[in-house]
Amino acid sequence: MSGALDVLQMKEEDVLKFLAAGTHLGGTNLDFQMEQYIYKRKSDGIYIINLKRTWEKLLLAARAIVAIENPADVSVISSRNTGQRAVLKFAAATGATPIAGRFTPGTFTNQIQAAFREPRLLVVTDPRADHQPLTEASYVNLPTIALCNTDSPLRYVDIAIPCNNKGAHSVGLMWWMLAREVLRMRGTISREHPWEVMPDLYFYRDPEEIEKEEQAAAEKAVTKEEFQGEWTAPAPEFTATQPEVADWSEGVQVPSVPIQQFPTEDWSAQPATEDWSAAPTAQATEWVGATTEWS
């Protein structure tokens, strides 16, 4: 579909995005109508999708979407969680009408219900999961575009874009690529400059993981505020008068104190030691007498 125009050729950065998101990885089962989009089969049984065919069908789908005069007449549907955020982002960027979540049966065929719509083009994320809108589209002659895996049935699908429609990153990247090509063909954005919208905004995120990340960020912010509060507290003001600092380089006069002279004693001239044996004997005699009197 790109023809000989170099502008429409797939760039190297686009190939790297496809490989990083796992868009080329199919399943272990293969539908006979999807054989034309298969490049090779791995030793573990996983089929590899030809990204060149993916890019050509992506451009064809973008041309079909641009051909609709009113962007609101394009309905984009995803009943699976992995594609709901991407569908809403695609609708916000291109002006399409999103249906994220459960598809109400009779939306395209039952004119009585309030949710009745008459779109001119239908784009679904998974032909197997979104079989109800595809079936109703066949009743009202509605052309359809679908992101198809290797095992996806192509019944009621007019334009099949071969890709991995199971992974959250692959589905988000395919919707991002489709939105970018639609805006480029409309002339809204230039091909010479990269689109400022990142593919991460189209990726599905688990609500539990988002809640855990927000909780961790809040705890980190509280800890940071407490840490900064300890260091940014105002220092106490000292109102006491500061003592004058003397010049330590000047010499300090120390008052002179006379040294007292003490006479030295001759320890060899001490009197002889008294006889300690007499005193205890006398004391013992006195105590004996006292005991005799008491008895």
From Swiss-Prot:
The modification N6-acetyllysine is found at residues 52, 89. InterPro entries: Ribosomal_uS2, Ribosomal_uS2_C, Ribosomal_uS2_CS, Ribosomal_uS2_euk, Ribosomal_uS2_euk/arc, Ribosomal_uS2_flav_dom_sf, Ribosomal_uS2_vert. Required for the assembly and/or stability of the 40S ribosomal subunit. Required for the processing of the 20S rRNA-precursor to mature 18S rRNA in a late step of the maturation of 40S ribosomal subunits. Also functions as a cell surface receptor for laminin. Plays a role in cell adhesion to the basement membrane and in the consequent activation of signaling transduction pathways. May play a role in cell fate determination and tissue morphogenesis. Also acts as a receptor for several other ligands, including the pathogenic prion protein, viruses, and bacteria. Residues 161-180, 205-229, 242-295 are annotated as: Laminin-binding. It comes from Chlorocebus aethiops. This is Small ribosomal subunit protein uS2. PROSITE patterns: RIBOSOMAL_S2_1 (PS00962), RIBOSOMAL_S2_2 (PS00963). GO terms for cellular component: cytosolic small ribosomal subunit; nucleus; plasma membrane. This protein appears to have acquired a second function as a laminin receptor specifically in the vertebrate lineage. Acylated. Acylation may be a prerequisite for conversion of the monomeric 37 kDa laminin receptor precursor (37LRP) to the mature dimeric 67 kDa laminin receptor (67LR), and may provide a mechanism for membrane association. Cleaved by stromelysin-3 (ST3) at the cell surface. Cleavage by stromelysin-3 may be a mechanism to alter cell-extracellular matrix interactions. It is found in: Cell membrane; Cytoplasm; Nucleus.
